[in-house]
A protein has these predicted regions:
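Residue-level detector of Asp-centered blade-edge/turn motifs that repeat once per structural unit
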Residues: 25-27, 70-72, 132-136, 182-185, ...
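Short, solvent-exposed loop/turn segments at conserved positions within beta-propeller repeat blades
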Residues: 33-35, 85-100, 142-147, 197-206, ...
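Short loop/turn segments immediately following the C-termini of beta-strands
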Residues: 34-36, 80-82, 144-146, 154, ...
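Short loop/turn segments immediately following beta-strands, especially the blade-tip
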Residues: 42-49, 105-112, 151-160, 210-218, ...
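A short beta-strand motif characteristic of beta-propeller blades
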Residues: 52-58, 115-121, 163-169, 219-227, ...
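Conserved beta-strand position repeated across blades of beta-propeller domains
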Residues: 67, 131, 180, 238, ...
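Asp-box/WD-like beta-propeller blade repeats and closely related beta-sheet repeat scaffolds
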Residues: 113-183
Length: 416
């Protein structure tokens, strides 16, 4: 747990400006990217497809995830000294850690610089994902081990308030990986990945847990688990901006699924469509996984990460021999069916996170892992232009020093 005086000391360094080369054309969005406990801010030049590092802050432990307030005035970050950000690629055992927290920041409307507000909140275990509800009234946090959820009120000034008591025992599945709230603010989705089988035990079954949501209070509603959750390891989901379609990334299966949403927000029990995310599914390697996904703001395309890396006996990351790409799909606007139209090489390894800028003219992929010195592949931010047909054109990459921690999270946030 971090003391308030230490957090205040961290706050003093939030506005520290790092040296930079040339100021790009102004952008109404900023990119934030972590390297361990450091969270760096980059200015975006959309016309030149360029990033300029401007400042950074340091959190008490490795950044796990972050999410903006709907007003875009505030920004929330969760951190932990446990979990996969402290482990080698493919590791079967990861530290649980002792320092887990949630912090609130005010976003400078001109520059995107972050200023801490209020006191950080200690969390019970490693947070793996977080989001803010559509009303901007509550922040929801998902934990993978033990799989669980907490909700905190947000105060009028954007700072974090008290925990919201839940009235009953929540069905939080096995290995929660993402928590999202629908646009109507009435339904919460907890994506629980489960775990793949090992030589000693069968798989832990995956599911998408669905809760009713009333101002931060959750109530069990449904569990979506085709085939009883067997061979079903969902990681992340996203929503179509105008149609009642939910898109789901299956990690171990390297699949994209589409579900219909009823008027009350409940997904169908089985997918409408299931598609392969890899360019050549027959060549799938041992450490090949699907990652996060994002629907284009116009609803015509969806993007999904494919990830591959392994570690040697010393824990150093190596090329997994598989595919590190962003899969691009065109979405049929009448049926919701996705058609794979491109697998764009990310020019790095393990693109754990990626984001589109608000204009959807750029996509930036955060290649998490630096491969061994022999292979000479650095962790990096890879920048792509987005064509009108949804396909990606690689422009350049910016290496990220991960000597003190991996590029575990990055995102692009529109300024207030």
């Amino acid at each position: 747990m971090m003391k308030n005086r230490n957090f205040a000391a961290i706050s003093l360094g939030l506005a520290g400006i790092l040296a930079f080369a040339q100021t790009p054309a102004p952008s109404r969005a900023v990119l934030y990217a972590s390297a361990g406990a450091e969270l760096a801010q980059y200015q975006i030049d959309v016309d030149q497809a360029a990033l300029i590092k401007k400042s950074s802050i340091r959190l008490p432990a490795n950044v796990q995830y972050a999410w903006p307030h709907p007003s875009r005035k505030y920004f929330y970050v969760v951190w932990s000294d446990g979990g996969a950000s402290y482990a080698a690629p493919g590791a079967t055992a990861v530290p649980r850690g002792k320092t887990h927290g949630l912090g609130a920041f005010r976003v400078d409307p001109g520059s995107g610089a972050l200023q801490a507000i209020g006191s950080p909140v200690p969390l019970p275990s490693r947070p793996i994902h977080m989001s803010v509800d559509a009303a901007g009234a509550n922040v929801l946090v998902a934990y993978n081990d033990p799989s669980s959820v907490t909700v905190h009120r947000l105060k009028a000034d954007g700072s974090i308030g008290s925990a919201v008591p839940q009235t009953g025992s929540l069905d939080s599945g096995i290995y929660a990986h993402q928590i999202r709230v629908d646009a109507a603010n009435k339904t919460v989705f907890l994506v629980t990945r489960g775990n793949g089988p090992t030589k000693d035990k069968p798989e832990d079954r995956g599911a998408v847990k669905v809760f009713d949501h009333t101002n931060g209070v959750l109530k069990n509603r449904a569990s979506i688990a085709p085939n009883g959750g067997v061979n079903f390891q969902p990681r992340h989901l996203d929503f179509h901006p105008s149609q009642p379609w939910l898109f789901l990334s299956l990690e171990r299966q390297n699949k994209l699924q589409v579900y219909s949403l009823a008027k009350d927000g409940l997904p169908g029990a089985t997918p409408r469509f299931t598609k392969d995310s890899l360019a050549n599914p027959a060549r799938k390697t041992l450490r090949q996984n699907a990652g996060t996904l994002h629907v284009h703001p116009n609803g015509k395309f969806i993007y999904q990460a494919n990830r591959s890396a392994i570690s040697d006996a010393s824990g150093k990351a190596l090329d997994g021999g598989g595919e590190n790409s962003i899969a691009v799909y065109a979405i049929n606007q009448q049926t919701g069916e996705p058609t794979l139209i491109q697998n764009a090489d990310t020019h790095g390894a393990e693109p754990r996170t990626f984001a589109l800028d608000p204009s959807a003219r750029l996509l930036v992929a955060g290649n998490q892992t630096a491969l061994s010195a022999l292979q000479k592949v650095s962790a990096n931010l890879a920048v792509f232009r987005v064509r009108d047909d949804g396909k990606l054109d690689y422009v350049r990459k910016y290496d990220v020093d991960t000597a003190k921690g991996s590029l575990f999270w990055m995102g692009i946030v529109a300024l207030p």
